[in-house]
From Swiss-Prot:
GO cellular component terms attached to this protein's record: Golgi apparatus; Golgi membrane; plasma membrane
SUPFAM superfamilies the record matches: MFS general substrate transporter
Membrane-spanning segments: 11-31, 52-72, 81-101, 106-126, 139-159, 172-192, 221-241, 244-264, 283-303, 309-329, 338-358, 374-394
UniProt keyword terms in alphabetical order: Cell membrane, Golgi apparatus, Membrane, Symport, Transmembrane, Transmembrane helix, Transport
Domain of life from the UniProt record: Eukaryota
Keyword check for Ribonucleoprotein: no
Function noted in UniProt: Proton-linked monocarboxylate transporter. May catalyze the transport of monocarboxylates across the plasma membrane.
Organism, as annotated: Rattus norvegicus (Rat)
PANTHER family listed in its UniProt record: MONOCARBOXYLATE TRANSPORTER, MONOCARBOXYLATE TRANSPORTER 13
Compartments it resides in: Golgi apparatus membrane; Cell membrane
Family as reported in the entry's similarity comment: Belongs to the major facilitator superfamily. Monocarboxylate porter (TC 2.A.1.13) family.
Gene, per the UniProt record: Slc16a13
Cytoplasmic face residues: 1-10, 395-428
Protein name: Monocarboxylate transporter 13
Pfam families documented for this protein: MFS_1
Amino acid sequence: MVHRTEPPDGGWGWMVVLSAFFQSALVFGVLRSFGVFFVEFVAAFEEQAARVSWIASIGIAVQQFGSPIGSALSTKLGPRPVVMTGGILAALGMLLASFATSLTHLYLSIGLLSGSGWALTFTPTLACLSRYFSQRRSLAMGLALTGVGISSFAFAPLFQWLLNNYAWRGALLLVSALSLHLVACGALLRPLSLTEDTAVGGPWAQITSLLCHGPFLRYTVALTLINTGYFIPYVHLVAHLQDLGWDPLPAAFLLSVAAISDLVGRVASGWLGDAVPGPVARLLMLWTTLTGVSLALFPVAQASTTLVVLAVAYGFTSGALTPVAFSVIPELVGTGRIYCGLGLVQMIESVGGLLGAPLSGYLRDVTGNYTASFVVAGAFLLAGSGVLITLPHFFSCISLSTSRPQDLVIEAPDTKIPLPKEEGLGEN
């Protein structure tokens, strides 16, 4: 383990960025492209859209709800063994899914087992990355998360090609092989010890203090609302386009168009997050609002050109909000608590990930089309952007990380934990 007084803002941190790049591709790139499998599962098991939607929703929810476990294990054991174990579980889940004979099997294999593997990989990696960077944190986060955009661009048509040539069982076998590369990504994570770590207490003390922290709780509410609508296009856009008369392959390529725009948005947002003065939460509110508007406009579009424009707009803004969403957390809780803070955020926002796609599928079953599904998804994002305005210093011209007054001690049951006042812990 490397010991430092403060984040190095580079060095081995760039290898952690590389690891996070491939991990984000192999976790959320797969999840975002799973809409290609959606139509196949509906036909294979002769089930309603709402029931099939639970496969991806359970996977997202387990990944997020199990994040505190991955965070606590990483605090004790370091991120490397935890992430490598998660890679094995993710691959095993996809392998078992290829033998499924019912939706229940897919709920357990992809949703529960692969979701558990994703919980042990994604959050510890991003937390490790946040500890390596301070001044360039948003840029590093943006570069790392471009893996989602690149893989979404590549995986959607790739998965459709695999389905056409090997059917869904053979395609899942190959996705399992891809997921096994998460083990190699975990090997790149070198633990970093910071001076701040000695003052934050153990995992339970950190969790207790965060649950008493008003701004942190409001932020988790905002992300939960955002998460409810965020993934809807990646689950139901292909099906929506097929309802409009599109062939499966062109519909999958529209996801790729959104993925290219997503990639550009992540890099641009990461650069802006470090370059623009003021709290990063303001940028997050802007991108969230624009994402919600573009989602709500999808049912209005009928022409191919209009749908492509909306896909580009949605891809850019949804990609742009992701790196700044993760960059706000260390500003609120400090780098010493980033493992537990990020884990708690992922757990609480899992409620949105669990309910979003099934709600969208239910609205489609009731109304006969996806109009209400996309409008409601956009409304959830707009509601989340409204909550972001309540964060401390939102209207200030100075970022939370630029001022560092004296420490403040917050009392939790049976423990006293010194916390930096600049991180908003004195505000409720």
